Amino acid sequence: MAAVTRRQFAPLKPGAAANSNAPRLKGIVFDVDGTLCEPQTYMFGEMRQALGIAKSVDILDHIYALPTKEAQETAMESIRQIERNAMASQVAQPGLANLMSYLDRRSVRKGICTRNFDAPVAHLLGKFLEGSLFEPIITRDFRPPKPDPAGILHIARSWGLVKPVESQREGPGDKAAEGTQGVQGDASELIMVGDSIDDMTAGRRAGAATVLLANDVNAHLIDHEHTDLVIRRLDELIPILEEGFSGRELASST
C-alpha cells in the first residue's frame, strides 16, 4: 500500500515556527556549477575530449579507475586546467546574493558539495559572495563524489546532526561488521540545492529534501522522483523558506 508524504520544514519567519508541526530547517547544501554560478556545461565536452572518453562515461569514475596514481594525477590535472580557464568567465546565478543575504539574516548554515576542485569554488566565493560563510566545503578531493550521499552526510555530521547506526552482525561469533560506527550524519533536516541528477540523487539518498534549480537543459528532472521542489531563480527560495518549505507529494510503500 502506498502512503502519500511530502517534505516540509517550519517557516523561517520570526515567530511563525511555533505554530508549525514541521521540523526546523538545520542547513542548506549547495552545488556550485549550474547552481551558485550559471552552467558552464561546455567544460564537460572539453574534459571528455581531453580524456578520450564517451559522453556516457562518468569523468571522475574514469579517472579513479586508471591503473596508476601517476595516470590519475595526469588526467586530473588535464581537467583542472579546463576548470581554471572556465572560472574566469563565471557568472553568478540570478538571485544568488539575495538568497545568501537572506540565509545569513536567518542564521541558516550553508555548505557546499561539488564535483569541482577547490580553485573554481574559491574564485566564485571571493568574486560574488565575499563575507558569506560556507562551511564545510566538500570538493572532488572528498570521495566518493556525488551521486553518493557521503559528502552530504559528512556535512550533516560536521554540523552535529547525527543518528545512531545499528551494528550489523555477521558470522557465528556475532561479530560486528568491520567499519561499523555508532553514529552517522543525519541529513533529514537539510536541503540539497542543485541542478543535476547527481545532486538530486545524492540529496535523496542522504535523506535530505531536494530543490532543483531548473533550466532549459535539466527540465527533464522537474518530474524526477528524486526532486522535491523546483525553482527557476535562487531567490525564489526566500518566500518558500519564509512561509514554510513544502515539497511535492511523494508516494512511498508501507
Locate predicted features:
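Conserved Rossmann-like nucleotide-cofactor binding loop
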Residues: 35, 42, 118, 198, ...
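Conserved SAM-binding loop
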Residues: 36, 110-113, 192, 230
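Short, acidic loop-to-helix structural element flanking the phosphoryl-transfer center
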Residues: 85-112, 118-122, 149
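Short hydrophobic segments within beta-strands
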Residues: 31-32, 113, 193, 213
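Asp-based, Mg2+/Mn2+-dependent phosphohydrolase catalytic module
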Residues: 1-26, 101, 122-254
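Short, basic/glycine-rich phosphate-binding loops at helix/coil junctions
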Residues: 72-83, 132-136
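Hydrophobic alpha-helical core bundles mediating ligand binding, dimerization, or RNAP-core interactions
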Residues: 44-48, 80-83, 121-124
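Active-site neighborhood of HAD-like aspartate-dependent phosphohydrolases
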Residues: 2-62, 68-71
